[in-house]
Amino acid sequence: MNKLLIIDGMNLVRRIHAAQPNESDITGLKERVHGACRKLLKYHIPTHAAIVWDGDAISWRKTLFPDYKKGRKPMPEALANGLNDIKAYLAEHHIHSVDADSEADDVIATLATKLVNIDGEAIIVSTDKGFSQLNHPKIKLWDHFNQTYLTIEEMEKKLGIERSQLIDYLALAGDSGNKIPGVPGIGPKSAVELLRIYRSLASIYNSIDKVGAKQAKKLEAGKQMARLSYKLVQLKTDMPLSVNLKQFRIKKPDSE
């Protein structure tokens, strides 16, 4: 069975770089990133591997909602200037890079979905909880920094919802890290309680007359924001890709 290791490039690199006291110093960074990739390959033993990078184009999410990710700390200039060197170094060691036009998330989701649809297995290396919405038994999420899988049970316990409700939850409660608004006045606790009773965002709005007056007023006022937030958090799994699985095959063990 084909097993594809998909690494969220910027998620990995920025966290490795964050351990550096001086953000302008990228000395040894490419070697540390390569070391992390070697460790991932050794542990998971995939048949194929790719590291996916964000691109510079404005994402469809930013076009839809200009405040998306607004205020997020920009990438340090030294790191931005060193990315091509990191990619080249990884390529020398047989780790294939995929450059997304804008956000890597949708490309990662598409790669994973395409593979499991042909009976393969995908392991996504990222700390981004948004990938939890890819509800398939052969798609696994690996947190490299905590050296653990993000399990369904752990996510459900942490958020108080079922995995299938993640998009509905974020549409209601929002996601401050990505500046996704959610419904004003409906926080995490209210979102969990509403989903416990009504199960989904659509059912909540279809049952608005049964919701308490105070919450119903907030939900009605924030209906458009809920719809917008739902779109923003939902991963696309049908992105056009100009790559094929053969490109990602691991040609030989990386034993350097």
UniProtKB/Swiss-Prot annotation:
Cofactor: Mg(2+); K(+)
Region span, Interaction with DNA: 185-190
SUPFAM superfamilies for this protein: 5' to 3' exonuclease, C-terminal subdomain, PIN domain-like
Residue numbers binding K(+): 172-173, 181, 183, 186
InterPro entries found in the cross-reference section: 5-3_exonucl_a-hlix_arch_N, 5-3_exonuclease, 5-3_exonuclease_C_sf, DNA_polI_H3TH, FEN, HhH2, PIN-like_dom_sf, Xni
GO function term, MF aspect, one: DNA binding
Keyword match Ubl conjugation: no
UniProtKB keywords: DNA-binding, Endonuclease, Hydrolase, Magnesium, Metal-binding, Nuclease, Potassium
Domain 5'-3' exonuclease: 163-256
Annotated EC: 3.1.-.-
Gene Ontology terms describing biological process: DNA replication, Okazaki fragment processing
A Pfam family recorded for this sequence: 5_3_exonuc
Cofactor note (record): Binds 2 Mg(2+) per subunit. Only one magnesium ion has a direct interaction with the protein, the other interactions are indirect. Binds 1 K(+) per subunit. The potassium ion strongly increases the affinity for DNA.
Signal peptide: none
Family: Belongs to the Xni family.
Record's protein name: Flap endonuclease Xni
